[in-house]
């Protein structure tokens, strides 16, 4: 709108100037009419020229993303957002949680699970890119930085990036929250995931395989000062092999009717050196590993993963170290072109030497209705938490982000979730 209005702004300015001349020296008005008309014409011509330059100097629109770009394509800014709004019903047995607080057997309520704003693009060269994303807290509304990364893609398949981002470890965590199969990720993922860290990552990709390597401040080290990070240093590596299909189709966990066959295997490992500080507890080194497989075809998809975690400090119960495991399997099947049913089973396996060494099992099932793909979809599911927190020491209480509340020694909790997602 601004370029179109520039001639009118210029004309108004010229008229104002002319009025000033008239009132300042009325007798001279007749003698200066030609000069005023010439000045107005010159200003209008100049404004029209600037308007044309503005129109020719930038591009804007929507090609899957809202964007602003230079005509030569060397500069581009994309603006995006994500909104997830839920209604949750949580059912537990009366009793007390692990902190000995009384349990309310029915907890219903709305939740704004995710509200995110993102900016990404490139400058000077399409290979020199940036990505900045933040989210508003669902409990306080405070805006918090998630991703802040800069990278460069080389022509030979190699790439490097640095900043704050998710380390290349669990695939379920690496797949965007906007592209999950169920309402949210699994309980196993919430316990073992890498989250974000401040790091440098180098990657290499071919049509059949790709590898990622990162040097970082450790798992869950986002928005930390350099002297307040959880580890002195950490390294993470992930390798993926593509047996069929394309990399693009594995950006989510679903496969639409008519989708091509795809099969991918992933392996990852992470080691971090615990902080060595005077007067601090013994150094706790961490080693985590995972293997996962993704298979999808015409209207159906399958995914499975196994995760292991070794903590060298551990506890006195385990003789100085803890070994914990988790696994999950999930699948989706389209019933119509827009309706997809899904189910998931996941299990947490604590160290057998701990007092709370019972496995914790969760069953999830539900459906997606896609109005416009992931950009506008309705999801509903039911989670059955079959065991109790007190019997599984790996659990640390509630995971409210997925609707799970601390059930103490009472098993049999179940949760019903309804969610609408909008992406722009």
State the predicted function of each range.
Residues 64-221, 228-247, 251-261, 322-350, ...:
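Outer membrane beta-barrel
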Residues 27, 31, 58, 92, ...:
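Outer-membrane beta-barrel pore domains
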Residues 3, 252-253, 288:
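A generic local structural motif
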Residues 11, 18, 55, 59-62, ...:
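Intrinsically disordered, low-complexity segments enriched in small/polar residues
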Residues 1-12:
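Bacterial N-terminal signal peptides that target proteins for export
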Residues 7, 34, 38-41, 237-241:
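N-terminal presequences and immediately downstream first alpha-helices
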Residues 2, 17-84, 91-96, 247-250, ...:
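N-terminal periplasmic/intermembrane-space "pro-region" immediately following the signal or transit peptide
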């Amino acid at each position: 709108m601004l370029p179109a209005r520039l001639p009118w702004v210029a004309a108004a300015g010229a008229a104002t100037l002319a009025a000033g001349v008239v009132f300042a020296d009325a007798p001279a008005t007749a003698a200066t009419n030609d000069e005023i008309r010439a000045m107005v014409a010159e200003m209008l011509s100049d404004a029209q020229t600037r308007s044309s330059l503005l129109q020719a100097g930038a591009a804007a629109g929507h090609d899957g993303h809202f964007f602003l770009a230079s005509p030569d394509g060397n500069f581009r800014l994309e603006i995006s957002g994500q909104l997830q709004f839920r209604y949750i019903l949580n059912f537990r047995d009366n009793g007390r949680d692990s902190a000995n607080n009384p349990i309310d057997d029915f907890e219903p309520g709305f939740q704004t699970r995710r509200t995110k704003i993102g900016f990404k693009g490139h400058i000077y060269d399409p290979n020199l890119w940036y990505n900045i994303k933040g989210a508003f807290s669902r409990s306080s509304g405070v805006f918090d930085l998630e991703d802040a990364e800069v990278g460069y893609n080389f022509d030979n398949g190699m790439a490097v990036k640095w900043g704050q981002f998710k380390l290349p470890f669990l695939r379920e965590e690496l797949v965007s929250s906007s592209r999950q199969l169920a309402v949210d990720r699994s309980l196993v993922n919430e316990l073992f995931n890498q989250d974000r860290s401040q790091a440098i990552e180098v990657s290499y990709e071919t049509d059949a395989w790709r590898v990622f390597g990162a040097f970082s401040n450790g798992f869950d080290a986002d928005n930390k000062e350099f002297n307040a990070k959880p580890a002195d240093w950490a390294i993470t590596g992930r390798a993926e092999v593509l047996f069929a299909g394309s990399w693009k189709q594995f950006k989510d966990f679903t496969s639409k009717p008519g989708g091509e066959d795809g099969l991918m295997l992933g392996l990852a490992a992470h080691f971090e050196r615990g902080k060595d500080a005077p007067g601090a507890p013994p150094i706790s080194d961490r080693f985590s590993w995972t293997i996962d497989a993704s298979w999808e075809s015409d209207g159906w998809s399958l995914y499975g993963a196994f995760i292991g975690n070794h903590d060298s400090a551990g506890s006195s119960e385990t003789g100085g170290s803890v070994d914990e495991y988790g696994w999950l399997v999930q699948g989706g099947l389209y019933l119509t072109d827009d309706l997809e049913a899904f189910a998931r089973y996941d299990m947490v396996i604590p160290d057998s030497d701990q007092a709370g060494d019972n496995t914790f099992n969760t069953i999830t099932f539900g459906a997606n209705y896609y109005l416009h793909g992931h950009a506008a979809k309705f999801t509903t599911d039911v989670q059955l938490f079959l065991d109790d927190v007190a019997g599984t020491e790996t659990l640390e209480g509630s995971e409210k982000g997925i609707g799970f509340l601390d059930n103490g020694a009472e098993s049999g909790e179940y949760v019903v979730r309804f969610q609408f997602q909008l992406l722009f």
